[in-house]
Regions:
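Conserved catalytic core of two-metal-ion nucleotidyltransferases
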Residues: 23-31, 35, 353-376, 424-520, ...
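C-terminal catalytic/acceptor-binding lobe
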Residues: 29-34, 53-70, 229, 236-239, ...
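Active-site nucleotide-sugar/metal-binding loop of Leloir-type enzymes
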Residues: 140-157
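Short, acidic, metal-binding catalytic loop of nucleotide-sugar glycosyltransferases
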Residues: 78, 98-110
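Conserved catalytic core of nucleotide-sugar-dependent glycosyltransferases
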Residues: 168, 172-252, 432-467, 474-482
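Active-site nucleotide-donor binding segment shared across nucleotidyl transfer reactions
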Residues: 372-405, 415
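Short beta-strand-to-loop acidic/aromatic patch adjacent to the donor-nucleotide binding site
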Residues: 154-169, 408
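N-terminal signal-anchor transmembrane helix specifying type II single-pass membrane topology
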Residues: 2-63
Length: 545
C-alpha cells in the first residue's frame, strides 16, 4: 500500500513539473561548454606531457628532414650570417682538420676563423676553404690589427665550435640560428644558444653570480624547471657549441679569453645575459684526444694555467662550485698579499670600486685567531682598537674594505709574551722573528709598537699597540696624525674589559663599545660607513650596499 502511494505521489509531481525543451537545450549547452573548456585547457597546457612530446617530435622531425632533403636556402643564409670560430684546441694534439672538414661538407662556403695565441706548432693542416688563421701574438714587423680576431669576423653571428666535433647535417646549426633570432623579441636577455657535444658526462646548467666588489664567483645548480626542449642557464658545461651575436661578443671586455666559453658566461653574467641550452639535442663527438698519460697531463696543465690567468684578468679570488667546494686564486702563505703598499690609508682596490680580497680577509682572520690564542695563553690582556673595533660593532667581523687588524695591550704585560720579547730582541739586531708556524713578528719601523705578519712573504698583519695609564688616561708613545681615532681615552673603558663578536670568536673589547667608538670617531659612526679617506675618491664616500 505504501509503494502504491509513493508511486502516485511521484506521478503527480512529474505531471506538475514537465521538462521543457529550453531546459534540455540549456543542459546540452552546459555539457558542450564543459567539454570545450576541458579540450582547450588540455591543448594549452604548456607544461603538459602532450605538448612537450609534440614540440620535441617536431624539432626532431625538422632535423631528420634536413638530413634527407636539400635545404639549400637555409644553408646559404646560415653561411652568409654566421662565422665559425675555433678557439679551444691544443696545438700538440687536435682533431681540428677533420672537425673543419665535417663542417665544410654541409656548409662549403662558411667562413671559418681559427684563433691561436701563438703560431701553432706543429703547423695545422687545414682543408681548403674560406679559412683564416689568426695568431694573436704578432711579429715585430706586423700591424697590431693583424692579431685581433674581431677584424676577421664580419658576419652578424658567430658560432664557437670546440675541437673534435662532427656536424651530421645542416639542420641543427640552422635551428640554433632560428632559435637565437626568435629570442630577440621573446626573451631579449637570452643572447646565447648552446647545444652540448654528446659525451658520457652529464650536461650541467648552472646559475652564476659574479660579485666583482668582493672578487667572488659563485656557481649553483639551476633549479629552474626545464621547458619542453631547452633550459635557461647562466653557465653550461662541459663541452658545447655556442652561437651568439657578434656585436654582443665584442661588447665584452675580453671576448676571446680562454677557457672558452666559460670566460664568456662569466662576463655575460655581469650584464644579466642568459644562455638557452637545447639540452635534448647534441652534436656528435669526433676523434678521442689525450688518450695517453703524457698528453692528458699536458692538457690538464694547460687548462689549469689558462683558468688561473682568466681569474687573474677578471679579478676573481674565490670560486664557490655547485658541489659546495671552494677554490682560491688569491694570495697564500708563500706569496705576497693581493695589494701593494697603502698610501693615504686607501688601498689600491678601493680605486677599482672593489673591497678587500676574500683571501686577504681570511688570512687576517687566521692571524688574529693565532695572536689572540697566544696572548690569552700568556695572560696578556688585549682589546680591539680603531677600525677593528668598529668592524666588530658594525659587522661582527673585519670591515669589508679594511687591510689590517689593530689591537691594544697593556705595556707592562709585554714581558709575559715570549713572542713579543723575541720580536724586540730581533729588532735590535735588524732582523725579524719567524715562529714555527711561519708567522713573522717584528718591532714596527713606524714607531713604538709590534706587528705580527701572516708570513715572511705575505705581509697581511695585526698591529699591536702598547698603552699605559697616566692620570686615569690611556696613552702611548706613537701616534698617527692622519688617524683621527688615534687619541688618548679614559682608562675606565678598560675597567673591565668586555667581549664582542669578531672574526668568528668572542674577542676582548672596551666596555660601552658604542660610547667608546663615538668618542674616537664621532657620533653615528657605527651606522654611517665611510672609507678612510673618501676625498681621494671622485665618487661619493658613503658606502652603498
Amino acid at each position: 500500500m505504501r509503494d502504491i502511494c509513493a508511486k502516485t505521489q511521484r506521478d503527480t509531481i512529474q505531471r506538475s513539473m514537465p521538462i521543457t525543451k529550453c531546459q534540455v537545450v540549456l543542459v546540452c549547452a552546459i555539457i558542450c561548454n564543459c567539454l570545450i573548456l576541458f579540450y582547450v585547457s588540455h591543448v594549452q597546457n604548456i607544461n603538459g606531457e602532450w605538448f612537450e612530446q609534440s614540440r620535441l617530435a617536431a624539432i626532431k622531425q625538422k632535423i631528420a628532414f634536413g638530413k634527407t632533403k636539400n635545404a639549400a636556402e637555409p644553408s646559404r643564409q646560415f653561411e652568409s650570417e654566421v662565422t665559425v670560430v675555433f678557439l679551444e684546441f691544443e696545438e700538440f694534439e687536435n682533431d681540428l682538420p677533420r672537425t673543419i672538414r665535417s663542417i665544410l661538407d654541409h656548409f662549403p662556403n662558411i667562413h671559418v676563423v681559427v684563433i691561436s695565441r701563438k703560431r701553432p706548432y706543429p703547423p695545422l693542416e687545414l682543408p681548403n676553404g674560406k679559412i683564416q688563421l689568426v695568431v694573436q701574438e704578432i711579429q715585430p714587423d706586423q700591424k697590431q690589427s693583424s692579431g685581433r680576431p674581431e677584424n676577421y669576423i664580419t658576419t652578424q653571428y658567430v658560432m664557437f665550435v670546440p675541437d673534435s666535433v662532427r656536424f651530421d647535417s645542416t639542420s641543427l646549426p640552422v635551428m640554433m640560428l632560428s632559435e637565437l633570432k626568435a629570442m630577440a623579441s621573446i626573451k631579449p636577455q637570452v643572447k646565447v644558444v648552446a647545444v652540448p657535444v654528446k659525451t658520457r658526462m652529464a650536461i650541467q646548467c648552472n646559475n652564476l653570480a659574479f660579485d666583482v666588489k668582493r672578487w667572488t664567483l659563485e656557481y649553483s645548480v639551476s633549479e629552474e624547471e626545464a621547458e619542453s626542449y631547452y633550459r635557461t642557464c647562466d653557465s653550461v658545461s662541459p663541452s658545447q657549441v655556442i652561437l651568439l651575436k657578434t656585436a654582443f661578443l665584442h661588447s665584452l671586455s675580453a671576448p676571446y679569453m680562454r677557457p672558452f666559453p666559460e670566460s664568456v658566461f662569466i662576463q655575460a653574467s655581469l650584464h644579466h645575459i642568459k644562455t638557452k641550452l637545447l639540452h635534448k639535442m647534441s652534436f656528435s663527438p669526433g676523434f678521442k684526444l689525450f688518450t695517453n698519460a703524457h698528453t692528458a697531463w699536458k692538457f690538464e696543465n694547460n687548462v689549469k694555467t689558462r683558468t688561473n690567468e682568466m681569474y687573474l684578468k677578471l679579478g676573481v679570488k674565490k670560486v664557490a662550485h655547485p658541489s659546495g667546494q671552494v677554490s682560491w686564486y688569491g694570495c697564500a702563505k708563500d706569496t705576497g698579499r693581493c695589494f701593494g703598499t697603502v698610501y693615504d690609508d686607501m688601498p689600491e682596490y678601493l680605486y677599482m670600486s672593489r673591497w678587500t680580497p676574500p683571501c686577504c680577509l681570511n688570512h687576517l682572520r687566521e692571524t688574529a685567531h693565532y695572536l689572540f690564542d697566544i696572548l690569552n695563553t700568556a695572560g696578556v690582556r688585549y682589546w680591539l682598537e680603531g677600525g677593528s673595533l668598529l668592524g666588530a660593532a658594525r659587522y661582527g667581523d673585519i670591515i669589508p674594505w679594511d687591510y689590517d687588524v689593530d689591537i691594544g695591550i697593556f705595556q707592562h704585560e709585554i714581558s709575559k709574551c715570549s713572542y713579543l720579547a723575541e720580536a724586540e730582541k730581533h729588532s735590535n739586531s735588524g732582523t725579524k722573528f719567524i715562529d714555527d708556524k711561519g708567522y713573522t713578528w717584528e718591532k714596527a719601523k713606524e714607531g713604538d709598537f709590534y706587528r705580527i705578519q701572516y708570513s715572511q712573504y705575505n705581509h697581511l698583519h695585526v698591529d699591536i699597540f702598547p698603552f699605559f695609564e697616566k692620570d686615569g688616561v690611556m696613552t702611548k708613545r706613537t701616534w698617527f696624525k692622519t688617524h683621527r681615532q688615534d687619541r688618548e681615552f679614559p682608562a675606565s673603558y678598560l675597567k673591565p674589559l668586555e667581549t664582542i663578536d669578531f672574526v668568528g670568536i668572542k674577542a676582548s673589547a672596551p666596555n660601552h663599545v658604542r660610547e667608546f667608538l663615538e668618542f674616537k670617531f664621532g657620533k653615528g659612526v657605527i651606522e654611517n660607513p665611510q672609507y678612510p679617506n673618501p676625498l681621494k675618491l671622485k665618487k661619493k664616500s658613503i658606502v652603498k650596499y
